[in-house]
Design a protein with these regions (language model features):
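Extended, highly charged clamp/arch subdomains and adjacent linkers
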Residues: 1
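Electropositive polyanion-binding surfaces
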Residues: 4-445, 461-499
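Short alpha-helix capping/helix-loop boundary micro-motifs
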Residues: 398, 449-455
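Surface-exposed acidic, glycine-flexible loop patches that form ligand/cofactor-binding
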Residues: 458
Length: 499
């Protein structure tokens, strides 16, 4: 439970709960336009809304309206300092630790339906090839016409079923899907990497009891919003870079060549056919490796190997490009409710004229931004770890209630003492070598595999196992399994390693 200071609480209750006429002065009125939000069914903090039209010249006009949080959270105010402390919202299984007070996140800054909200609108004209031909942004006021859900939109996109209340929006949604696919195709042509969806989802009942565990579904609606947010962040980053003033970029640098080659060599030694890496600087090369593996059932294991060869993304005032997205410049501005640097970018855009004409000192601004970038990057990793550790506790609870269940699993990593394994449901655990029920296996440190000297059968990363619960330790968030080698896997591995 987050404890707020008196100053923070006072600021929360001093904020308006609705948009006033005074607030709307100087803003573009988009309240009559078909603008909607598309989020998860339980989302309360909605900070992005989308609208679309098609121009007579055949180009698409995409409007992405983002909650104007900086209008309410003044720079250096108590709530701003709180945001700098938290830096991000942390989404646990059954709760949210908000970056901002929930009365703000879910109230005046949330783009709730049928009420006016203050926004920054990013207007992007995109041609049928997916190229950005025009970009502008402006302060606006919107009135979202509907709170849509991914699930409902996917019914339209995947099953041609229109849920109640969606009838007036079908044409717009289909046009959005058309544009999203065009953007997706351009991203692939540029070399953008798709490591697949390896995010776990826990299905809970009303009491918080785990009913099931599965891969988080990423259907057409989820991809639509992802593509729209990516193209918005791309357009803004390119615009600001060309403008030449201080800004915050989301960098993902080129991977170290030796790391990439080491991982590809390991994957090749496991029997998979992968072309040798000549130039890892080009994302098309890594894209080709991914495409040669993504049809495999165990791809979620192989992709985690490839991900380890990548550098970590981070925030910086220096533009280094985004390797994974295959973009020359990238930013993150589409979630100012839940990410500090998105909020910081709003402050920059609010004061762009003062920065440009020198009223705001560029060197002082850069120093301040560098410190915020460093903290946000660090805290992002902490938040990811917190979510991961919370997930492991839920994994333990799920398995403890299914102790007699046999899980299909794969080897994710092999150490000198044990194997790290992951089930199809993305539940992680370990198997000590003594807990392999199919004979004695010896570790080969050079090849990083296990081999049974009697049968010559090898266990390597990606090998399939039958997993049975052995024990759990909640304090250390550890699941231990016994393992049984899948008969078919044994035959396949022998075939692979004979060549």
């Amino acid at each position: 439970m987050v404890r707020y200071s008196k100053e923070e609480i006072d600021q929360v209750y001093s904020l308006p709960t609705e948009v006033t006429d005074e607030d709307k002065k100087g803003r573009v009125d988009l309240t009559d336009e078909n603008i909607v939000t598309i989020d998860g069914a339980h989302t309360k903090d909605m900070d992005d809304a989308v609208g679309i039209t098609k121009k007579p010249n055949g180009n698409y006009l995409l409007k992405v309206s983002i909650s104007h949080v900086s209008r309410y959270i003044k720079y250096n105010s108590p709530l701003f300092m709180r945001a700098c402390h938290n830096t991000t919202s942390v989404y646990l299984i059954d709760s949210v630790n908000h970056m901002l007070h929930p009365q703000i996140s879910n109230g005046i800054c949330s783009l709730n339906p049928n009420v006016e909200r203050l926004t920054k609108t990013y207007q992007i004209e995109i041609n049928p090839k997916g190229e950005i031909v025009d970009f502008t942004f402006f302060d606006s006021v919107i009135k979202s016409k509907k709170k849509m859900t991914y699930e409902d939109c996917n019914e339209i996109f995947e099953n041609n079923v229109v849920p109640d209340g969606y009838e007036p929006f079908v044409n717009d949604l289909l046009l959005m899907q058309e544009l999203a696919q065009i953007i997706e195709n351009r991203r692939k042509e540029n070399g953008a990497l798709d490591f697949g969806n390896s995010e776990i989802e826990f299905i809970l009942d009303d009491d918080g009891t785990i009913l099931d565990v599965t891969h988080r579904h990423q259907g057409p609606a989820e991809k639509l919003i992802e593509n729209f947010m990516v193209v918005t962040n791309e357009a803004l980053a390119e615009y600001m870079y060309n403008l030449g003033i201080e800004f915050v970029y989301r960098n993902h640098e080129i991977p170290y060549d030796d790391k990439v080659k080491e991982v590809v060599k390991l994957i090749t030694s496991m029997g998979y056919r992968v072309d040798a890496i000549e130039n890892s600087d080009d994302p098309h090369v890594m894209q080709a490796v991914i495409n040669s593996l993504n049809s495999k059932e165990e791809f979620f294991i192989l992709s985690s190997l490839l991900l380890r060869s990548m550098q970590k993304a981070y925030f910086s005032t220096e533009n280094k490009g985004h390797y994974g997205l295959a973009l020359n410049a990238y930013s993150q501005t589409t979630s100012p409710i839940r990410r500090l640097m998105d909020l910081i970018i709003e402050y920059i855009l609010d004061n762009i004229d003062k920065i440009y004409d020198g009223t705001i000192d560029m060197e002082k601004l850069k120093t301040s931004l560098n410190g915020l970038c460093e903290r946000a990057s660090m805290m992002e990793r902490c938040a990811d770890k917190a979510e991961y550790e919370a997930n492991k506790l839920y994994m333990i609870d799920y398995v403890l209630k299914r102790q007699d269940t046999e899980f299909d699993g794969y080897i994710q990593e092999i150490t000198p003492r044990y194997m790290v394994v992951k089930t199809k449901e993305l539940i992680e655990g370990i198997v000590y070598f003594d807990d392999i029920l199919d004979g004695n296996y010896a570790y080969n440190p050079d090849c990083k595999w296990l081999e049974n000297p009697s049968t010559r059968h090898r266990l390597m990363i990606g090998s399939k196992l039958k997993l049975h619960f052995k024990e759990a330790n909640r304090e250390y968030r550890l699941l231990k399994f016994n393992a049984e080698v899948n008969t078919l896997e044994r035959e396949m591995t022998l075939t692979r390693t004979k060549n």
